[in-house]
Amino acid sequence: MRPKSWGWISMSERLEGKRVRIKAKGKIFEGIVMPSFTGNFVLKLDNGYNVGFKEYELLEVLEVEPFEPHLPELVKREGLPDVKIISTGGTIASKVDYRTGAVTSQFTAEEIASEVPELTEICNVDAELLYNILSENMKPENWIELARHVYKALKDHEGVIITHGTDTMHFSAAALSFMLSTPKPVVFVGAQRSSDRPSSDAAMNLLCAAKAATEDIGEVVVCMHGSTSDDYCLVHRGVKVRKNHTSRRDAFQSVNAKPIGRIDYPSLSVEWLSWRYRRGERELKLTDRLERKVVLIKFFPGLSSDILEYYHSKGYRGFVIEGTGLGHVSTDWIDTLRRVCEDSVVVMTSQCLWGRVCDRVYDTGRDILRAGVIEGEDMLPEVALIKLMWLLGNYSIEEAKEMVKKSVAGEIEPTTQY
Amino acid sequence: MRPKSWGWISMSERLEGKRVRIKAKGKIFEGIVMPSFTGNFVLKLDNGYNVGFKEYELLEVLEVEPFEPHLPELVKREGLPDVKIISTGGTIASKVDYRTGAVTSQFTAEEIASEVPELTEICNVDAELLYNILSENMKPENWIELARHVYKALKDHEGVIITHGTDTMHFSAAALSFMLSTPKPVVFVGAQRSSDRPSSDAAMNLLCAAKAATEDIGEVVVCMHGSTSDDYCLVHRGVKVRKNHTSRRDAFQSVNAKPIGRIDYPSLSVEWLSWRYRRGERELKLTDRLERKVVLIKFFPGLSSDILEYYHSKGYRGFVIEGTGLGHVSTDWIDTLRRVCEDSVVVMTSQCLWGRVCDRVYDTGRDILRAGVIEGEDMLPEVALIKLMWLLGNYSIEEAKEMVKKSVAGEIEPTTQY
C-alpha cells in the first residue's frame, strides 16, 4: 500500500532525511528517505545506492543517533598556502544532508577536510558559513555582503573559494568582479549534482577550485567541470561565463572569450588558455555600492515599449535590452528609447548571446544609436545588467555612460573570439 | 574636403544608391554609393569591389538609366517540382539593391533565377514579394498574414520557401509551425551577409533551401549554413532552432534536438539526422489566431515580481518565465505566481536554453509547481512564448494549460538530447 498524501505534503516528504525500515517487493529494506523527484518513495541504502519504490509498506521509523562528527582537528601544514572557503549554500554544500539525516551542513574546515581529504594536500583550509540559501534567492544585497567578507578574507589568505548554487553563480561572479579589485584569486565553485549521487561533481570541482585559488591569478573566476567526464575543470573569467545547460556537469561556458585555464584531474596540472590578471597585478580595493533600480528586458516581436516607460516612471535609470541579432528592437521603440535615454543609461546587448553587438550596420541599429542607446559590445546581457547596477551605484549617469563602453574587469574583449 | 552632415543625415546617406563620380587620393573614382557602416564614404566600383574614403571631393551625381532587367522569360521545365518563394525582406532580399542603385528589389522569379541560375535545375520557381521589412519589425500580425499566404501557396506547389531577415526568423518559423499543419516542406531561409559581400551566404542558403523544399519533409524548417565554410547547410525544425550568434554564418543551431538533416554543398545530397514529419504525413490546415497579450519575462536576481502584476492588470493571461537553472525564480515570487496562475497560464522555461526544466528537484521548484506554474520541458523560451500566443488565440485557458505540456509541432522532445 502506498501511503496517501496529506494535501501537498506526501508521506515521502514528511519522512525525508529519516531512517526507516520498509517492506517492498517481498523484501525488507532499510535506509534514509531521500527527496523524491518522481513521486516514487526513494531510499538511500547503506551501500550508498538509491532505490525507488512505487509500492511499499512502512514498517518502522528508526531513531538515529545524533550526529557526532568526531573529526580529527586539522593541523596547519607548513609551506602550504592559506585558503578561505566561504559557503553560500547550493548543491555543493548539501553534501552532508542525507548522509546523516541532518539537513543543514555545519560547514567547518574539519568537516570539509574529512569529506575531501585531498584538499589538505593543496592548501590549509579556513571555512566560513555565510549563507545557506538556494542561489535563485541570492539578491544584490547578498552580493554586497559577500564582497565584504571576501575582501576581508583576502587580507590574510592567498586565495578565497566561494561555494555557491549554480543557478545564479555567474551573476554573483560578475557582481564580485566589478565590486572587488583583487590581487589574488577569488574562485566560485558549485556542483550540478549533489554529493550523495554517484555522478556528483562536488569533490572534483572543489579540488580544482582549491588549485586555482593557489595559482597565479588575480581576478574573480568560476571553476567547474569542463566536460561530462571527470577529466578536467575549466577556469572561466567571472564576467565572461554563463550557465548554458540546466543539468549537465559542464554547463558553465565562457562566452565570447576563451576560458582562462584548464586544470586536469586528478593531476591538477594547469594549462593557461587565455590572458588573465596575474597575482599581485591589481591592488585590493572594494567598491561595493549597487543600484537596485536597473532592469534587463528581453525583446521579442510584438513586445510594446511601454515596459520601458513603466520602469522609467518607477525611477529606473539603468536599462539593459536583450535585442535581436546585432542588437535590434522594433522601429516603434525608437521614440520611447530617445525619451528614456535623456536621463538614463540604456545598453543594447544581444539575445544571440554569442557575438558582438553592432548597431552601425542596419537602419534600425543606426536609429537606436541616434536615440542615445549604447552598444554593449560583446558583453553578456547578465553581465551588462550587473555592470550597470555597479556603475550607477558608484558613479554619475554621465560617468556610467562612458565607463559602460570600456572594459573594467575583462568583460569586453577587444575582438570577438569565434 | 569631406561634406558635412545635415543633422543626422550625412551626405553619404543622402547619396546612397546613386551613381557618383568623385576625386579622392588624387584619382577619379566612379561607382554606386553604398550604406556606410563606419562613417566612411563607400563606393561600389564597377568591378564589384567596395572602396571606402575618409576624404573625398564630390564631382558629379550621374543620372542612372532606369533599371531594365531584360531578363529572359523563365520556361517551366517538365518534371521539376513547383516551388513558391515568398520574400519578407531582410539581408537575403537585399541582393539587388546596390547592383543597380535600386533600393527595393522587384523580387520576380526571373530576377531570382538570373541571380542564382542553379535554382532552375532544382525546381520551377514562382515568386511573391510579401514584405520588404527588416525582421526586427516583424509582428504577430505579419505572422498571421504570412501563414495565410503560405497556406494558399501550399495548395498548388510542392514546397514553399520564405526568405526572411535572420534576427527574428526563428520566431516566425515557430509561429508558422503552430499555425500551419502542412503536408509539404515550408522552408525559412536567410543570409547573415548580404549578397554584395564576397562572403555572402545568400546563394548557397537559397539553393539548399530549394533542395529542402523539394524533399520528403512535411513541416516548417529553417535552412542555414551549418559551418563557417561553404560546405553544408543544416535543416532545423522550426520549433527547435535559435539564432545563437550575432554575425556568424552558422549562427542558427538546433537546441535540445538534432537538426533534421544536412544538405551538402554544392552536391546538394541530403543526409537525415533525426526524425521528421514526412511529406503527406499531416493534412493541410490553418489555425491562425494569435493572442497578443502574452509576455516573456527573463528573471534575474533582484527582479521584483511586480512585473507579473503589471502585465496581469493589463489583461495578460499568458506568461512565459525564463527562470534560472532547472526553472527557478526567487522564493518571494511564489505568492504573486499563485495569484496570477488562478486565471492565467504561466510556463516556466530556462535561461540556460540548453537542457530541460525540472521543478521537482529543489524546494523552490516544488513551490513553483504548487503555485500552478507549468514546466516548459525542453522548449526554448521564445518557442514557449509563441506557443502560448497560439494556444490562447485558439483555445480556452484550461485547454491551453493541458496542451502547452504536450508536443504540438515537435517542440517538446521525449528525452533531452545532449
From Swiss-Prot, chains A, B:
PROSITE patterns: ASN_GLN_ASE_1, ASN_GLN_ASE_2, ASN_GLN_ASE_3. SUPFAM superfamilies: GatD N-terminal domain-like, Glutaminase/Asparaginase. It is an enzyme of class 6 (ligase). GO terms for biological process: amino acid metabolic process; regulation of translational fidelity; translation. Keywords: ATP-binding, Ligase, Nucleotide-binding, Protein biosynthesis. One of its GO terms (molecular function) is ATP binding. Disulfide bonds: none annotated. The active site is at residues 91, 166-167, 243. Residues 81-407 form the Asparaginase/glutaminase domain. Belongs to the asparaginase 1 family. GatD subfamily. Heterodimer of GatD and GatE. This is Glutamyl-tRNA(Gln) amidotransferase subunit D.
